């Protein structure tokens, strides 16, 4: 094993050869820059006065401070105002190298690898049932509400060939996870229910595939349904650019019923047939390159991360660079928990060793030069801080006068935390908006409590148990905690919270009517109207309108309300009572009293 590891091609050479250094500087009257920066940094690089820049923005109606992160357009405008030429330079470093660099392999080093298949489709169209049959396990019943809420990667063998599957959730909250699945995959199996046809998430999945330039195989599920309409379904697919072979197109199709285990082998055959055309290959003799599919925190083990190796071979003990982390892989296992020493290209694995769960969708690369890896990780970490500053600054400046409701999200997995964040950040109304200031994995910590207290945030947890000590601290610090295990509930709660910040609009609602049958006069109080309740109710404090011969003569409030000399809060239809109307004594027998309450209508 050690010989194979030392013989692997190092990724460092490819990276170093393609890194492009570009300095942010003012040179010969031209300001060269690579991206966003703070006002302070811009002033420092151009020898300008930062306070003067802030002042000029203020005069232009923009309330910035020296830490405000400038948009590229604002940098260009400042250059023009100060008679600088400007040039946006491309810089490839630790912040973006995995998106910009290509890894080259010699043809003789390439071998056939397992295809990576993503299953997509509309909610309840049978994706999870299909993957359930593929894995020969029972995911469906273990998920809250029967809807898949975590991305998983699994592998099967068909006709002596490995096939890797990714299952992506169908609910609209998981759009980012489906997009990520499309970008990782070689082929998308689009599950469409024979009775429902093409639905919103079906269309969305098709768009993801087109954007990622990924071929589609359609699996028409629920063929056992009596109300299926295949002609309609095929037409709907064609309208969305998916023309199947039966209609003269190139898209392969399989038909079946996942629940009845029908058509699945035929689907595998279609996958292997398309793989022959795609000629998928990788170099097992290089350090690993791949993508993080999912991550979560296990209380005993720490960060558990599901990955897919797309090129190279991953060994236990390898160092992986992902985002701003550089970590040694301590354990490797397959999706069933079996320990592994290595993972081949095209295969999934669950790994441990990361201090913090990596963001789902992040690319990773194996690097055996620790000093170089730390440099790249440091550059990425710096850029993340700049982006966070920009995000916070942009949110504060673009609140549009709305009340900002800060939210902290804690979830059991990274992908779900991301999905919740993506949904909540779109929520707003005319007077308030949601701002997610933190979204991560694992139990609530003291740091979370400090952040929530400092930012006046609500904490939402998903699929987590909150420790009694934390609950007690939440009460002491008066921090609101809301826990759920279904995403819909979190979204609904946030909408209700937004509604609470809307200025209320009230309308008058008539609640009852009475007529005066006798008049009493008391020197200390004034006139008492002995009355009979004809309809509805009268309540203490209610609005009252007094009519005499169909003419409105007074509007006021019920100041006192008594029955049989006892004070009461309410009198119902058919009962007599005595009342004094506030600041009104000119009451007469046969006057009609109409009672009203203000009812909120928004």
UniProtKB/Swiss-Prot annotation:
Q: Where does GTP bind?
A: 121-128, 167-171, 221-224
Principal localization? cytoplasm
| Entry-linked InterPro entries | EF-G-like_DII (IPR053905), IF2_II (IPR044145), IF2_N (IPR006847), P-loop_NTPase (IPR027417), Small_GTP-bd (IPR005225), T_Tr_GTP-bd_dom (IPR000795), TF_IF2_bacterial-like (IPR000178), TIF_IF2 (IPR015760)
Q: Where would you find this protein in the cell? A: Cytoplasm
| Region of interest (G2), residue spans | 146-150
tr-type G domain location, by residue?
112-281
Q: Which residue stretches belong to region G4?
A: 221-224
**Sequence segments annotated as region (G5):** 257-259
Region G3, annotated ranges: 167-170
The segment annotated G1 runs over 121-128
**Pfam families listed in its UniProt record:** EF-G_D2 (PF22042), GTP_EFTU (PF00009), IF-2 (PF11987), IF2_N (PF04760)
| Keyword annotations of the record | Cytoplasm, GTP-binding, Initiation factor, Nucleotide-binding, Protein biosynthesis
Q: Name one GO molecular function term.
A: GTP binding
Cellular component GO terms, alphabetically? cytosol
Per the entry, what this protein does is: One of the essential components for the initiation of protein synthesis. Protects formylmethionyl-tRNA from spontaneous hydrolysis and promotes its binding to the 30S ribosomal subunits. Also involved in the hydrolysis of GTP during the formation of the 70S ribosomal complex.
> What family is it from?
Belongs to the TRAFAC class translation factor GTPase superfamily. Classic translation factor GTPase family. IF-2 subfamily.
Q: What is this protein called?
A: Translation initiation factor IF-2
Please tell me the species this chain comes from. Answer: Mycoplasmopsis synoviae (strain 53)
